[in-house]
């Protein structure tokens, strides 16, 4: 069952984020393990700066609310990480996490708290058609 992670899930969330980092082929950050930063980030998310949708032992989708680059009074919800452990990728965990995120984004938009919400597609992500879920492609990011 998908639920919101809380402070008692910190260690499990950090461990899962390390798995996400290691599987996403970000060679530039493989050695980064700043636990102090992770605890601060998670504390801010748990205090209301975002949410972590979580299925214990299976996967998570982490998102944060941030000001847009155009106006510090206009906010957007950004997905930071969507990860399902490989042994659970044939089930519904990934879709349910995605669905929880979409519902949260729609809820925030309807309440006027954000203007938009984003979804990231990594080069190692499944080839999903995000347009089916109301998203439109705006950019691509390249890393060097």
Regions found by a protein language model. Give the residues of each.
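Conserved acetyl-CoA-binding loop-helix of GNAT-fold acetyltransferases
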Residues: 90-105
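Conserved catalytic-core motifs of GNAT/GCN5-like acyltransferases
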Residues: 120, 136-144
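A short, internal acetyl-CoA/4′-phosphopantetheine-binding micro-motif in the GNAT/acyltransferase core
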Residues: 80-92
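A conserved beta-turn-beta hairpin within the catalytic core of GNAT-like acetyltransferases
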Residues: 68-79
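A short helix-loop-beta-strand connector motif used in the catalytic cores of GNAT acetyltransferases and
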Residues: 40-54
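Short amphipathic alpha-helix that is part of the acyltransferase structural core
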Residues: 1-33
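Conserved beta-strand in the GNAT
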Residues: 57-66
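Conserved beta-strand-loop-alpha-helix junction that forms the acyl-donor binding cleft
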Residues: 101, 114-128
């Amino acid at each position: 069952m998908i639920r919101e992670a809380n402070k008692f899930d910190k260690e499990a969330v950090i461990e899962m984020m390390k798995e996400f980092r290691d599987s996403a082929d970000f060679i530039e950050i493989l050695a980064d393990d700043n636990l102090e930063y992770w605890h601060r980030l998670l504390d801010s998310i748990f205090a209301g700066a975002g949410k972590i949708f979580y299925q214990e032992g299976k996967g998570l989708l982490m998102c944060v609310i941030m000001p847009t680059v155009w106006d510090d009074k206009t906010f957007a919800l950004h997905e930071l990480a969507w990860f399902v452990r490989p042994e659970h990728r044939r089930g519904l965990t990934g879709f349910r996490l995605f669905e929880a995120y979409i519902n949260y984004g729609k809820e925030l938009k309807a309440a006027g708290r954000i203007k938009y919400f984003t979804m990231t597609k990594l080069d190692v992500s499944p080839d999903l058609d995000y347009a089916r879920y109301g998203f439109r492609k705006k950019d691509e990011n390249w890393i060097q």
